[in-house]
Amino acid sequence: MMPLIHLWTSLPVAKLEVGHHFYWHIGNLKVHGQVFITTWIVMGILIVAALAASRNIQRVPSGIQNLMEYALEFIRDLTKSQMGEHEYRAWVPFVGTLFLFIFVCNWSGALVPWKLIELPEGELAAPTNDINTTVALALLVSLAYFYAGLRKRGLKYFTKYIEPTPVLLPIAILEDFTKPLSLSFRLFGNILADELVVGVLVLLVPLFVPLPVMALGLFTSAIQALVFATLAATYIGEAMEGHGGEHEEAHS
């Protein structure tokens, strides 16, 4: 495992950086410490919310329980619409975790004044403001749809690369690379651009002028979380393919 990590860190792409970072050294690895800090904060928020919602469950939900049940119902419907009636249940936790994590990450960047917290080097920002986070999430989705396809269809899964004709093999292989690329760079680019625009406006103009832009940022941040989760569910549903008929029934 360690030789693979050293091989990855030796590649030129592993040395690409955006902005200044607060580094932590773990053995021979150099990681972005500010991303770990904000990621742990987001994870803590989600864990506390889940515990608060499930601590004293009521038959008639209210407060945080009502909010979490609404989120669960929304995620369940989203997953069902993309995978069909008989396949979606096993994937609700995965898609839901992606959606909630990205949603809270994005909103933390829009609502929390991370830049007021001083670090020895670099600055805090939303975890999804770092390309490493979005690439990791996209690779998780890639592993998930490969796993779903192999689990559902076995080795027949690989026949999709030569259907309906072997001529499409290069395009099918290329698609497996473009999916995680588009997922990661879309999310990273939108969140980074939003935080940069708001940051510049706050420096140049009074407080009340950037407020509409911040409100728009909250909306686009939620949309990006929805887009990522929807595409993840779609890719997993397409990989299984055995649900084709059920998928059509779910939309009929």
UniProtKB/Swiss-Prot annotation:
Subunit structure: F-type ATPases have 2 components, CF(1) - the catalytic core - and CF(0) - the membrane proton channel. CF(1) has five subunits: alpha(3), beta(3), gamma(1), delta(1), epsilon(1). CF(0) has three main subunits: a(1), b(2) and c(9-12). The alpha and beta chains form an alternating ring which encloses part of the gamma chain. CF(1) is attached to CF(0) by a central stalk formed by the gamma and epsilon chains, while a peripheral stalk is formed by the delta and b chains.
Entry keyword annotation includes Cell membrane: no
Keyword Transport carried by entry: yes
Gene Ontology cellular component terms for the protein in this record: plasma membrane-derived thylakoid membrane; proton-transporting ATP synthase complex
Alphabetically ordered keywords of this record: ATP synthesis, CF(0), Hydrogen ion transport, Ion transport, Membrane, Thylakoid, Transmembrane, Transmembrane helix, Transport
Gene label: atpB
Annotated Pfam families: ATP-synt_A
Family statement: Belongs to the ATPase A chain family.
Transmembrane segments: 33-53, 92-112, 130-150, 196-216, 217-237
Functional description taken from the UniProt entry: Key component of the proton channel; it plays a direct role in the translocation of protons across the membrane.
Protein name in UniProt: ATP synthase subunit a
GO molecular function, one term: proton-transporting ATP synthase activity, rotational mechanism
PROSITE patterns the record matches: ATPASE_A
PANTHER family: ATP SYNTHASE SUBUNIT A, CHLOROPLASTIC (PTHR42823:SF3)
Domain of life per record: Bacteria
